[in-house]
Amino acid sequence: LAREQVIYHDRVVPFNTLARDFVQKLTGKSSYKGLTPEQVIGGWLLYPEVWRNESLIYIKSAELQQLLGLKTPYARLTDLFDGSVYRLREHWQQGQSKLAKAIQETDEKVGLILMLEQGTFIQPLPADGSVKPLSKIQVKAELLYNSIPFSKILFMVNLAFGLLSFLLLLHNCLR
């Protein structure tokens, strides 16, 4: 499933790219409870009533967490609705306050979930051949890119250089 190709942000990508971005956007992590991103999306499509009750929508704002009555930074989709009424609608406000930004971020996450449930989030390649699929090597390259945690590697390299620089400075000062 990871290698299947879809259209995402107006380009052809492996399904893994779309799924990883979806899970990353919702949870702040590239996977959820040991499940691959593809398993999360597949599970949501097959069992939406179960996934609506999973606490996977990351809400960074403590103020919004309190407003929603959350005990953790993760909300369930059902936490954001009272029946069919969207709870954030009454608090929706355009503006630059931290709460307004947190509400907008959460609203974007809810929008992605609703698009997935309505079938508009995943766009397969057209059967008529009007869109050129990726080559096998391009798919492998994208999957490799998705699997490497670049920010973690960059942090570790910078930390190592910083430590080496400090030790070199310390060595020079003690001479």
Please state what every model-predicted region is.
Residues 150-174:
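Selective detector of the "anchor" transmembrane alpha-helix that sits immediately C-terminal
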